[in-house]
């Protein structure tokens, strides 16, 4: 339903997208993942026909999206990041009726459709309330309702859970999952790695405008190369928070080690060099008479995979 092939786009000297391809099938959620500036929003705008690519082609339902016909545009729903298209001085109901009228519905049709969508996004009780009084989560749900006015086959959502609390974010994902289960093809752009597990069917990870990874969440986890660990050392401190010199000598050239900033006083943060092997470093510590009580990854598997592929060491 959604297909992008070899998309490239520059803004002056800056390369926003470089030979990016993406496919989203009916009933599928594809997470477009990456840090700020990776090119996610630009790709979403290319897919919806708002930005023309310098090279490559984007198609939705078999039709090229740039300068696409009005009837195709009506079959695509967009929830942009920081949506400013809502009118905050009128009610949620009035917002939906207004946009429904812009799409060619009669007032009666637009009103009936608005109430249907308010029920779908759980805003019926707030339908007549001025949308400026809505919480961030409620405004996001109203934005999704607006995107669904024409019953689109394809839904593009950019940073839907930004600034939402965990409960509101989970509600948003549940709503979108339900739409996909009813056949919608969904592109979900996000920089929040934790929200895609158990939600997205596939992942495309962008890094500085290029595709760094494409596959399932399980495949993403499989390529994780953890470099940072928390060690619990029973005899790790010489005095106060100072490290035993033997510890630094044991890991020198293969890792750095420092007292953890918080947590248990026996915890230390170990950061492996790129070519270092954890088992060998731990063996060196043991040989130096350092008692390694426990070792765990500083981050989860999926966080390690994301940060490794996105090129971050933070």
Please give the residue ranges for each predicted region.
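Catalytic Walker B motif of ABC-type/P-loop ATPase nucleotide-binding domains
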Residues: 155-159
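Conserved catalytic motifs of ABC-family nucleotide-binding domains
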Residues: 151
């Amino acid at each position: 339903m959604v297909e992008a092939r070899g998309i490239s786009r520059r803004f002056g000297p800056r390369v926003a997208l470089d030979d990016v391809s993406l496919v989203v099938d009916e009933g599928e959620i594809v997470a477009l993942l990456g840090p700020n500036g990776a090119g996610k929003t630009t790709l979403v705008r290319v897919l919806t026909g708002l930005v023309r690519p310098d090279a490559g082609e984007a198609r939705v339902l078999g039709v090229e999206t740039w300068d696409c016909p009005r009837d195709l545009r009506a079959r695509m729903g967009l929830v942009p990041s920081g949506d400013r298209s809502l009118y905050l001085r009128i009610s949620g109901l009035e917002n939906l009726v207004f946009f429904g009228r812009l799409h060619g519905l009669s007032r009666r049709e637009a009103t009936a459709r608005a109430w249907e969508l308010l029920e779908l996004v759980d805003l019926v009780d707030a339908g007549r309330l001025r949308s400026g009084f809505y919480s961030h989560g409620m405004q996001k749900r109203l934005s999704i309702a607006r995107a669904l006015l024409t019953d689109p086959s394809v839904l593009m959502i950019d940073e839907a859970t930004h600034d939402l609390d965990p409960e509101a974010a989970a509600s948003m994902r549940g709503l979108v999952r339900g739409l996909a289960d009813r056949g919608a093809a969904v592109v979900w752009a996000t920089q929040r790695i934790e929200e895609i597990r158990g939600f997205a069917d596939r992942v495309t990870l962008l890094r500085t405008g290029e595709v760094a990874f494409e596959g399932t969440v399980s495949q993403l986890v499989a390529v994780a190369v953890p470099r940072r660990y928390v060690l619990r050392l029973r005899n790790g401190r010489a005095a106060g928070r100072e490290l035993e010199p033997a510890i630094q000598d044991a890991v020198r050239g293969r890792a750095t080690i420092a007292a953890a900033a918080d947590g248990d006083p026996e915890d230390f943060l170990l950061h492996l060099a790129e070519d270092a092997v954890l088992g060998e470093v731990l063996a060196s510590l043991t040989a130096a008479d350092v008692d390694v009580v426990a070792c765990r990854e500083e981050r989860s598997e999926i966080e390690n995979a994301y940060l490794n592929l996105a090129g971050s060491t933070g």
